């Protein structure tokens, strides 16, 4: 009878991290659940006449493997001489010993329910730069997060080292600053170099290494994802290289939205947002390779754009659970989930800043709007109520200091890293107001009228406080920055919306069409400028040389962390990719309405901007596919819309300037500039405007 073996190869991962001090102070071993690599397994076997389960127990054995080192940030080291072929578990001389039983970590073991991480794209070498006889640099043409797949011919004991980078300098030398784990080894300001602690490398670069056997050697990462466009190989000459590819690896999320228009640059922006997002999704919404943490603030800023581009039902649910699982004893939500020690300007008790704590109620609300899971809504409410109680423990004047504000703003005061965001206290107060508005709506959605009255009452009191403290005599707010105007308009705090919009537009024009807001302000700006019909301004912003075009110079295919020089930023960071929601909602015209439950209320409101000649847009909801396509012809604009028949409500919003000549039924409503048409049961319509 054939013999069957099951071999599990273990790595350190997040469970056995190196004692590396990220940013010079955060040691993951002090905050995460840690231990020696271990396994729990049940093997299910089904025969013709019976079923059998074999579980991991004291009869299992272990041995040392072929990997001599692995770390999620720093890389892998492998000895090719210890195994046969390409199978690192097919060891030549395994020394099997009885396993040691462990109680394992605390908590409840839950089966994974999200899409898995997989290889989705392969890139070949676009250029090879030879440094010397035993060193060369490969350019793959685009930044990916993933693995190297390398085949070489080598001699016995030949050592090959790989160094990864997102960038090169003017001398074509690798510039690894943007991927140094936790800035370790980077000079962040003059005379200040981040120290990673005892045993840490001088520079926490992304590196792999392997010892060769004589003949063919095949190396492919197993335990470390790198963020890179360039890789430097040392220890071999170029003639020994047989094949090399960069493999993009990420959680495989199904695309549920597409966008294409007449402007190739706008199409590139759409693809860049998609690629940068995926590069940083590995079971959690990570920020960049330097940290790989799920920051609540980043998730909030990108939540709308994410849900239009990808099927996010499962991974949003997991993210909600992740933040709930790490709620602190006081009821507050952490800055990242899992919590790993960072709590910059937090509310206290290891909790995160106000805007970052918004991730829990905001994601729950977005999930309900798009996916309609009422059970998730009900199960989450007690945690949201405890969160509100934890926020109420702080005096209002103290609470509004507990945030990082509109992070990433161009007008951030770099001399005051933690408190330099524009209109900091005002935006913090708005975040608190938003917490209360969201929980009130959730209570209303669940039919809890008394709780709705309670929280909407609290929200109204905070609104009055905001108006009394931060409203200026001229109707503006706080420091009169772009951020302050955007927040005031988004949260409907202005007496005269039109006047405030014009003042904001004037500020943007004075900056040569540059929107200086940070990640929250930009996300909100895309919403308000579409809502109030100023979409041409957003196109001007997206096209301005000092904005995304500068980010994408030198054939860049991913977004950077910051605008400007990006001195201390990543070159593979998605936090400013929220514009993709505007492409869907404004140019593409497809919006899942605020009052929707499981995407059952849809607004079709395309913006026929003068500089765009056609748009093809689609979005797959849980109720079916929605399409909105429009094209300019000499005789007018042809608009084609397809909607499923199972919607509660679908409204078409069109400017009054267009004559429909009875192509649609009479409008059901109108405002100053638009007619509104009920197309709930239309299925497919085609009109000429």
Please report, for each region that a protein language model flagged, where it lies by residue.
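Non-catalytic C-terminal accessory modules of carbohydrate-active enzymes
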Residues: 29-45, 52-88, 111-117, 121, ...
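Alpha-helical support elements that line or immediately flank enzyme active sites
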Residues: 147-166, 223, 234, 297-326, ...
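Amphipathic, well-ordered alpha-helical segments in soluble domains
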Residues: 298, 319, 356-363, 435-438, ...
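C-terminal capping/lid segments that line or modulate ligand- or cofactor-binding pockets
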Residues: 77-79, 84-85, 291, 296, ...
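Extracellular/oxidizing-compartment recognition motifs
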Residues: 1-288, 297, 314-319, 334-348, ...
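Helix-terminus loop motifs that line ligand-binding clefts
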Residues: 172-200, 313-414, 546-564
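Active-site acid/base region of carbohydrate-active enzymes
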Residues: 28, 240-271, 277, 284-336, ...
